[in-house]
């Protein structure tokens, strides 16, 4: 006999949760959906109520990693007047009706502390760490993290001292931050360099080099061969965590490194004083011009680079508008780079074009690629 309620009515039937894809098990359906390129997620969320929350599901991204369907997505910070802090964007790839690809920078939520200037940036898997920076010329010890899966921000433990224009790099699950503070007291002296353990979420001081090499501001940083390179206007430093050893950078590297750079297959790429892209091989200790990209403009200023899945992505500021135009174009190019023989590095431009238009006097702060 069927159970009844105290009033004699039949109990309401419990509805089973809707299936993602009818006739498929949840595991199989999730495995299929995880392979859909991320640029289609906004459309995917419109398919049904069941799909609506799918793009914000941690299980979906865990499945993407499990089935090898992750993508390298470009994120860009741009300072746009009158804002003093950075506005954040991500590069969106769209396929148009005529089967051509369209690339554009689309806005995402900016850091809750938007007025930070001179922060250091590192990527750890699907997260971007924004480290320090100054607020009204006062160095901050704050650390913000952008979760690139969901475009949400959170704070983690503060550094031991405030910093601006520091260098940072990630090695073996630890973030090393160097410089960016004046060594004018005991606390700043022992914390001129410090390390953040991602697993324990704690900061520890790193034994610093001598006073003569402890610069305040760093203009560039990178990780090569298990070492963090921190470059200043003079007296750059190199730290090797495994040996806990400090050393000076090779002179040829120091003289040739200009602006934002990135490392691909252990070659450091940046642009030189003539605006040409060059690559530095730390084993051979030599700079070589990147050939095959002569159609790109000369990057005299306002350019930055990122390693996006093994491709060299270059972002630069186009010419500012003149006359009645008060707008400036942001350009992007993606280059397939690699060695040719023993003495040459070549690049093939896979695409290049305008990805955003911004007011004059805007400036690219940084670009990074995260895995999602």
From Swiss-Prot:
The keyword Repeat applies. Residues 19-66 form the F-box domain. Pfam families: F-box, Kelch_FKB95. Gene3D superfamilies: Kelch-type beta propeller. GO terms for biological process: protein ubiquitination. Kelch repeats lie at residues 127-173, 175-226, 228-260, 261-307. Pathway: Protein modification; protein ubiquitination. It comes from the Eukaryota. InterPro entries: F-box/kelch-repeat_ARATH, F-box_dom, Kelch-typ_b-propeller, Kelch_1. Keywords: Kelch repeat, Repeat, Ubl conjugation pathway. Part of a SCF (SKP1-cullin-F-box) protein ligase complex. Interacts with SKP1A/ASK1. This is F-box/kelch-repeat protein SKIP6. It comes from Arabidopsis thaliana (Mouse-ear cress). The lineage of its organism: Eukaryota, Viridiplantae, Streptophyta, Embryophyta, Tracheophyta.
């Amino acid at each position: 006999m069927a159970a009844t309620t105290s009033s004699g009515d039949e109990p309401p039937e419990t509805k089973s949760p809707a299936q993602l894809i009818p006739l498929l098990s949840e595991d199989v359906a999730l495995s299929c959906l995880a392979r859909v390129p991320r640029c289609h997620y906004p459309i995917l969320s419109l398919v049904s109520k069941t799909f609506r929350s799918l793009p914000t599901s941690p299980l979906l991204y865990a499945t993407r990693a499990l089935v090898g369907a992750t993508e390298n997505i470009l994120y860009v910070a741009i300072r746009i007047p009158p804002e003093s802090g950075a506005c954040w964007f991500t590069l969106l790839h769209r396929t148009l009706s005529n089967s051509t690809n369209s690339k554009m920078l689309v806005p995402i939520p900016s850091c809750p502390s938007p007025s930070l200037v001179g922060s250091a940036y590192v990527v750890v898997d699907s997260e971007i760490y924004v480290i320090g920076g100054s607020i009204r010329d006062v160095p901050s010890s704050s650390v913000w993290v952008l979760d690139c899966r969901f475009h949400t921000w959170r704070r983690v433990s503060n550094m031991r001292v405030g910093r601006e224009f520091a260098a940072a790099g990630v090695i073996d699950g630890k973030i090393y931050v160097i410089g960016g503070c004046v060594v004018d007291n005991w606390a700043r002296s022992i914390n001129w360099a410090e390390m953040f353990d991602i697993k324990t979420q704690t900061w520890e001081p790193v034994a610093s080099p001598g006073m003569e090499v402890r610069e305040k501001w760093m203009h560039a940083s990178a990780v090569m061969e298990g070492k963090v390179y921190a470059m200043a206007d003079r007296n750059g430093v190199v730290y090797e965590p495994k040996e806990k050893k400090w050393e000076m950078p090779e002179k040829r590297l120091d003289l040739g490194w200009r602006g934002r750079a990135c490392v691909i297959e252990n070659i450091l790429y940046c642009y030189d004083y003539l605006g040409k892209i060059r690559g530095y091989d730390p084993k051979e200790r030599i700079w070589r011009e990147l050939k095959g990209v002569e159609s790109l403009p000369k990057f005299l200023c306002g350019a930055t680079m990122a390693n996006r899945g093994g491709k060299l992505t270059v972002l630069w500021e186009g010419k500012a508008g003149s006359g009645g135009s008060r707008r400036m174009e942001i350009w992007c190019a993606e280059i397939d780079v690699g060695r040719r023989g023993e003495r040459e590095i070549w690049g093939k431009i896979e695409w290049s074009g305008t990805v955003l238009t911004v007011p004059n006097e805007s400036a690219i702060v940084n670009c990074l690629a995260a895995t999602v």
